Amino acid sequence: MTTLVELQSVTVTFGDRHVLDQVSMKLERGQITTLIGPNGAGKSTLVKVITGLRKPSTGHVVRQKGIRIGYVPQKLQLNSTLPLTVDRFMRLAGRYDENARKEALSLVGGTHLHHSDMHSLSGGEMQRVLLARALLQKPDVLVLDEPVQGVDVNGQLELYNLIQSLRDILNCSILMVSHDLHLVMAKTDNVICLHHHICCSGEPDTITNHPSYVALFGQQQSEQLALYHHHHNHEHDLAGSPVGPCQHNKQHGHDNA
């Protein structure tokens, strides 16, 4: 598996406060990684470090040479008095011809939106257009900040299916930022639980019973999300085989003891 972006002991400090503390992680080609954590956990800062918008105070960010990173923001503020069609909005991304713009919209199931007014789009349609705009550059890494915010439950499931399909078509790495795992559970390969440092990371079914996850999100949510809920000292993969505990930074005192 090819590593496209690697963070090595990244710390970001604002004044005396460590927003990110010794964060190490990798984004691999063909993998969907979901970043979760409470508000104020440092998720937005981590995204800025990955996309190159912020330099770490200490530590290193290693990006594969020549990779392209696409970014879909959590929300987009548009001037409601400014007429703007979807196609004109897509043109703002750079010098991509009409065929490229139509191809990107087609990939997200948004061909019919080509001439629509941006202000008339539903939440789900807006997310598809933002995705299409990010796809114009054919990214190796696609970063999605709360990609289903403002979308109803049925629309959320459709978007997660679309994101999974885009990963398969483009063979890219996808990083999704989310508050929880309710619908991303079956659509992600790896979960990183962040609270300034990485509390735990691994496959979704190993995360939901992890002490650090329970401490942040509560036992009830953990039990609701767990694929398998056993009172054992081990966990299970999807085939039912025992697996070891979630990888974890023991220096923060969150081990399984």
UniProtKB/Swiss-Prot annotation:
Membrane topology term: Peripheral membrane protein
UniProt GO MF annotations: ABC-type zinc transporter activity; ATP binding; ATP hydrolysis activity
Catalytic reaction(s) noted: Zn(2+)(out) + ATP(in) + H2O(in) = Zn(2+)(in) + ADP(in) + phosphate(in) + H(+)(in)
Residues the entry annotates as binding ATP: G37, P38, N39, G40, A41, G42, K43, S44
Keywords: ATP-binding, Cell inner membrane, Cell membrane, Ion transport, Membrane, Nucleotide-binding, Translocase, Transport, Zinc, Zinc transport
Cell compartment(s), UniProt: Cell inner membrane
InterPro entries: AAA+_ATPase, ABC_transporter-like_ATP-bd, ABC_transporter-like_CS, Metal_Ion_Import_ABC, P-loop_NTPase
Gene Ontology terms: biological process: response to zinc ion
Residue stretches making up the ABC transporter domain: 5-220
SMART domains linked to this entry: AAA
Major enzyme class: translocase
Main location: membrane
SUPFAM superfamilies: P-loop containing nucleoside triphosphate hydrolases
Pfam families: ABC_tran
Oligomeric and partner information: The complex is composed of two ATP-binding proteins (ZnuC), two transmembrane proteins (ZnuB) and a solute-binding protein (ZnuA).
Its job: Part of the ABC transporter complex ZnuABC involved in zinc import. Responsible for energy coupling to the transport system.
Family that this chain belongs to: Belongs to the ABC transporter superfamily. Zinc importer (TC 3.A.1.15.5) family.
Protein's UniProt name: Zinc import ATP-binding protein ZnuC
Gene: znuC
